[in-house]
Amino acid sequence: VGCAAAVEVLQNLQGEKHENIYFGVGTVQEEVGLRGAKTSSHKIQPDIGIALDTTIAYDFPGGDKNTELGKGVGIMFKDSSMIGHKGLRDYVIGLCEKAKIPYQLTFLERGGTDGGAIHMSHIGAPSISFCLPVRYLHSHTSIVHQDDYDAMVKIVTLLVKSLDKDTVNKITYQ
């Protein structure tokens, strides 16, 4: 799902004027050590890291309602591999609120995202993980909500278009 969203963001950015080079990378071996993210982020050396992933939809009986289907893209503030960059998270939340893009703040007690490797690569980069709530995660019948997927694509497109050198420096060094 993250790869599909990255491709759609690339399509949205095609022909648009912005100051950024956006790399959409489909990584491998995330579950066994973020290996693909380590090698690709070391090669790319990003100024800002954006991971597109999935998370558990907890909207089931007895679930903690951490992330629910149909309530927007998940903005990960913590997982076992990274505590998301507060300045970048605050910037993204501001973009979501201004553009009326639905979002949910979420966390993982176990497991991580490629953001965990990106934020430590080379000299480091402020990083954020956007996670799509999924019912029956890691199965052959996973279910996502189209509105959540659309929110993911919209916020990443908007984020890339909104960043310039001054904004990146402000986020990085605030």
Briefly describe each language-model feature range:
Residues 32-103:
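Metal-dependent peptidase/peptidase-like ectodomains
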Residues 25-33, 55-56, 134-136:
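Acidic, glycine-rich active-site loops and adjacent beta-strand->loop/helix elements
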